[in-house]
């Protein structure tokens, strides 16, 4: 069990908002480009309001001090996208090991799962134990 599964979830009520144009991000979104099932392309680049506020502050600081800026690679993602990316990563790892796999027996390959879970959280639909990136307001 991952450490975040032991931490009680307390939603702070902060809403998801669109990332403002003062912040730069990839367009199209890298996962959308791979075929990830975003239902609405206009809702891809969203974060909790407090996260946006902090990123704007850091970005302003970087620009003022060094003429650098943040380039956002990823943001909130729905569970369907998490599942798509997890399965994609799993398939790629299986291909590297020359393993033919179906997702019905995904747990039969713990060594592959371990590699994938270094970068991707398992796409759990359990509201008591969601993946760590997920905003519960959208479960």
Predicted regions and their residues:
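Active-site acidic/histidine clusters and adjacent loop/turn architecture
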Residues: 44-77, 87-92
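Short mixed-charge
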Residues: 99-109
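Charged, often glycine-rich, active-site loop that binds/positions anionic groups
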Residues: 79-99, 116-117
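Acidic/histidine-rich, surface-exposed loop or edge segments in extracytoplasmic proteins
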Residues: 25-44
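Conserved small/polar residues in nucleotide/adenosyl-binding loops
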Residues: 137-139
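Phosphate/nucleotide-binding catalytic core
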Residues: 71, 76-80, 90, 120-124, ...
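Surface-exposed short loop/turn segments
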Residues: 107-134
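N-terminal regions that are enriched for targeting/export leaders
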Residues: 1-22
